[in-house]
């Protein structure tokens, strides 16, 4: 290691100690090696002052001699230049100045070289020396960085203060420009409004996505004599008392009869037909007449028409209608029921092949699995009450039936001229579910809607045109007197016959029937009123037929029932329908009130509403139904309608019902 000599006067001339993030000590170093006797300990270095002074004196003398020699050389060079340049006085002053600058630079470089001869390179670090005095150098570096950071912070603070002053002055200028206004609401921009999108329920409220509907006016009627029907058909219609065709019959017959006549010459497929018409509008007659007219001249018996209905009563009703219309032909019309075993019924179908089969979907699927029925010659497929059949799976009947038809009616050279299956879909509340309708595999579908297109609310939920609807509002506190209110209202309105009352369950129908019978027995002493009920507990075919027969012949004046008979029950004598319990949907409401006002006859529907909750729900249901007349509100004064004596009799009737339950 070298000894070190520090000159305080030279510190001002030396370069900076901190350069580009590195600490570069600027130290003058001696060229003499430190002897062993100079070292006192690890951290202290002893300098030989006498020898240093002698060497310094020698160096100064040498420097002075060199300077004198340089001055003499410069003087000689100047004299020679003056002699040589005496003839060329035209040189410019700029050249002389440049030469003098060059000479000055050479002089400075020589002086710097002399200074460097006395010292070691300033940027070279002595690692051994700096390692011993590391703590001192670290403190020095820390102090240098702090000073630099302080300068940066102070400069940034000054800039922020200047910016704040400028922004403050600008705000003051803006405040001076703002106009003063009165104490009034400030004008606000118009709020953006969201675009109202059509909901999925609105989209599925109709069948416009399937085909363009064709509307048939309710008042559009036409005599059967104007249709091109066979003579036997005119006679059968006259014997049944049908003179004029209703709107749905006019629309269907006008389309299908010309197509049936055209298919006798060419096997053109005219497409399937979907019909939406209110209950009691004559849908059964609308599809029975074209089928019988098409099959009247058949030679070999084959299953050419299948009619699917949801319940057994509808099976009997449809078969009875078709048998009456087919009088004078050889058509074999059969119905499939659960009265006999499936094997015995299968043997009968194989022995005596029918022309028309009327069945429920579940029973038909069982026979298809046993190959009791062949669909190779099937010409017509009718789905009555289609919304109920499609909403209930019934052993996945639609997929099985359609797949069987495609399997047995293969399009090839042998049957290229044969007619394909034509589907007729009928319902009072036709479903709009695309997934359910797609299972029937429609071909060129056509939609007929019996309603006035200008007065539609929901084209698929409509009530009979001759129906009058009423709503009876009561407080929720009076719900405990509900059976008594119904009995007294029927007595006051003189509606003690041909009345159908709907309840929500089997238990409530039995309880209400018993309670009404007890009330009428105590109040109506002069006139005998018979009350009956119909639900799943007495749904056997024989018992059900007897009840309906008694109700039609007025042996039963008031019939209490559930929604079991709300579909397809064709009793034209019903004049009034009472919704004792409100419905769960507008679809069921349409089928309930459709039990009256059938075949263009007048009818009434009364709805008992207790409390604001039921009133709100009834409005929701009613808003989805298309009707010709508005629902009328009926105000009932309970103080005048029900006396104290009536309440006592009602309590006695409740006690008698309780005694029957205990027994």
Curated annotation (Swiss-Prot):
Disulfide bonds: none annotated. Gene3D superfamilies: P-loop containing nucleotide triphosphate hydrolases. Residues 39-79, 88-101 have a biased composition (Acidic residues). Residues 485-642 form the Helicase C-terminal domain. The keyword ATP-binding applies. It comes from the Eukaryota. It catalyses: ATP + H2O = ADP + phosphate + H(+). ATP binds at residues 277-284. The keyword Ribonucleoprotein does not apply. A motif (Q motif) lies at residues 222-250. Residues 264-448 form the Helicase ATP-binding domain. GO terms for cellular component: cytosol; nucleolus; preribosome, large subunit precursor. Its main location: nucleus. One of its GO terms (biological process) is maturation of 5.8S rRNA from tricistronic rRNA transcript (SSU-rRNA, 5.8S rRNA, LSU-rRNA). Keywords: ATP-binding, Helicase, Hydrolase, Nucleotide-binding, Nucleus, Ribosome biogenesis, RNA-binding, rRNA processing. It is found in: Nucleus, Nucleolus. Residues 1-119, 153-200 are annotated as: Disordered. GO terms for molecular function: ATP binding; ATP hydrolysis activity; RNA binding; RNA helicase activity. Residues 102-111, 168-177 have a biased composition (Basic and acidic residues). Belongs to the DEAD box helicase family. DDX51/DBP6 subfamily. ATP-binding RNA helicase involved in the biogenesis of 60S ribosomal subunits and is required for the normal formation of 25S and 5.8S rRNAs. PANTHER family: ATP-DEPENDENT RNA HELICASE DBPA (PTHR47959:SF1), ATP-DEPENDENT RNA HELICASE RHLE-RELATED (PTHR47959). The Q motif is unique to and characteristic of the DEAD box family of RNA helicases and controls ATP binding and hydrolysis. This is ATP-dependent RNA helicase DBP6. It comes from Lodderomyces elongisporus (strain ATCC 11503 / CBS 2605 / JCM 1781 / NBRC 1676 / NRRL YB-4239). The lineage of its organism: Eukaryota, Fungi, Dikarya, Ascomycota, Saccharomycotina. The gene is DBP6.
């Amino acid at each position: 290691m070298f000894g070190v000599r520090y000159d305080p006067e030279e510190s001002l001339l030396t370069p900076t100690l901190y350069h580009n993030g590195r600490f570069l000590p600027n130290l003058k170093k001696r060229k003499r090696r430190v002897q062993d006797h100079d070292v006192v300990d690890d951290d202290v270095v002893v300098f030989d002052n006498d020898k240093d002074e002698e060497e310094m004196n020698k160096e100064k003398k040498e420097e002075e001699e060199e300077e004198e020699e340089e001055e003499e050389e410069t003087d000689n060079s100047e004299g020679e230049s003056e002699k040589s340049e005496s003839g060329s006085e035209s040189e410019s002053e700029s050249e002389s100045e440049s030469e003098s600058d060059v000479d000055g630079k050479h002089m400075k470089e020589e002086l710097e070289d002399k200074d460097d001869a006395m010292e070691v390179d300033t940027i070279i670090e002595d690692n051994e020396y700096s390692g011993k005095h590391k703590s001192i150098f670290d403190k020095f570096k820390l102090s240098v960085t702090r000073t630099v950071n302080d300068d940066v912070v102070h400069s940034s603070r000054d800039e922020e203060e200047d910016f704040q002053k400028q922004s403050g002055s600008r705000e003051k200028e803006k405040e001076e420009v703002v106009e003063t206004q009165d104490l009034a609401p400030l004008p606000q921009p118009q709020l953006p409004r969201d675009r109202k999108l059509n909901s999925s329920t609105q989209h599925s409220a109709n069948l416009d996505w399937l085909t363009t509907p064709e509307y048939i006016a309710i008042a559009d009627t036409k005599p059967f004599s104007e249709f091109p029907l066979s003579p036997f058909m005119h006679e059968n219609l006259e014997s049944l008392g049908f003179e004029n065709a209703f709107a749905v019959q006019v629309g269907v017959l006008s389309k299908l009869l010309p197509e049936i006549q055209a298919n006798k010459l060419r096997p053109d497929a005219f497409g399937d037909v979907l019909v939406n018409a209110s209950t009691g509008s004559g849908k059964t007659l609308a599809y029975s007449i074209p089928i019988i007219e098409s099959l009247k001249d058949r030679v070999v018996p084959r299953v050419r028409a299948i009619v699917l209905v949801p319940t057994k009563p509808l099976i009997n009703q449809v078969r009875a209608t078709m048998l009456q219309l087919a009088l004078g032909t050889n058509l074999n019309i059969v119905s499939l029921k659960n009265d006999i075993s499936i094997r015995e019924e299968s043997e009968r179908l194989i022995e005596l092949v029918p022309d028309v089969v009327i069945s429920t979907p579940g029973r038909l699927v069982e026979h298809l699995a046993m190959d009791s029925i062949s669909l190779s010659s099937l010409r017509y497929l009718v789905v009555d009450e289609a919304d109920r059949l499609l909403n209930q799976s019934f052993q996945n009947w639609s997929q099985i039936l359609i797949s069987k038809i495609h399997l047995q009616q293969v399009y090839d050279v042998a049957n290229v001229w044969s007619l394909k299956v034509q589907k007729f879909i009928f319902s009072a509340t036709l479903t709009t579910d695309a997934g359910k309708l797609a299972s029937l595999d429609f071909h060129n579908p056509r939609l007929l809607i019996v309603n006035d297109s200008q007065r539609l609310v929901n084209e698929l939920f409509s009530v009979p045109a001759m129906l009058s609807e009423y709503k009876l509002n009561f407080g929720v506190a009076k719900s405990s007197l509900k059976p008594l209110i119904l009995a007294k209202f029927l007595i006051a309105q003189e509606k003690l016959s041909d009345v159908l009352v709907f309840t929500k369950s089997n238990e409530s129908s039995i309880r209400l029937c018993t309670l009404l019978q007890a009330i009428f027995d105590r109040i109506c002493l002069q006139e005998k009123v018979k009350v009956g009920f119909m639900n799943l507990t007495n749904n056997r075919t024989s018992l059900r037929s007897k009840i309906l027969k008694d109700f039609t012949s007025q042996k039963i004046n008031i019939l209490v029932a559930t929604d079991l008979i709300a579909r397809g029950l064709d009793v034209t004598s019903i004049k009034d329908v009472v919704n004792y319990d409100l419905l769960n949907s507008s679809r069921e409401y349409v089928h309930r009130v459709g039990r009256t006002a059938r075949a263009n006859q007048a009818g009434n529907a009364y709805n008992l509403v207790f409390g604001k909750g039921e009133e709100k729900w009834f409005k929701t249901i009613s808003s989805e139904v298309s009707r010709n007349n508005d629902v009328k509100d009926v105000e009932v004064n309970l103080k005048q309608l029900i006396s104290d004596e009536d309440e006592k009799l009602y309590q006695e009737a409740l006690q008698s019902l309780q005694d029957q339950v205990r027994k």
